[in-house]
């Protein structure tokens, strides 16, 4: 889900061919329905929306938000996930996530695409496989999760300076991430097929120094509640109240929950949702 402009919200309906458009009051108005297996969204904040798709060996679709029609595409790596628009370029995280079922290997690259011409300019090899999930952005800095292979290759966190296209790798996952001020708040979920267990970690990264602190900093009290959750599924901080919200997918087949915490990490509310797997929150004034 993404705020395209002051009056339009776009939602990529996971594992479908549909992007649903709505007003901020929740009224659905139209849809783009011809992007198979669509994934993540980015916008230039003006006239265009960009969507990654796992179909056709992996591509990005460019949509004119005035007509809701696809006007161009660009092939990138296999199974592209996160996408961000920065300074006329698109940064696209390639996963190769279907590697276990197909003949291609996992991807470890970030495709850089000219947003105007929709031509791939380069691929930056991070050396970290399976760049899976939504990305967090703070100014020119981008936080990307490398999920590994759940066996021998451990998950990692990749942080890129999009202005210089330089990056740094950290030895912990950033499965769920958000930006607040000049910091990234990171929840890592490390799963092992060998043991069948999840391990949850938390870190705060200061920018631009990339200094890392274990835990959630001033929200340290949140970890007590996260440890009780069945399946932590997202972390978000309101830019208006500084409240932190953590979602719990629970069993992935029943109603999810959202936990609200104060700016000092005190639990304020728990919300039981109608839907399952609450993975995104959009804040509006």
Question: PLM ranges: what are they?
Answer:
Residues 1-285:
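Predominantly soluble domains enriched in secretory-pathway, periplasmic, or organellar proteins
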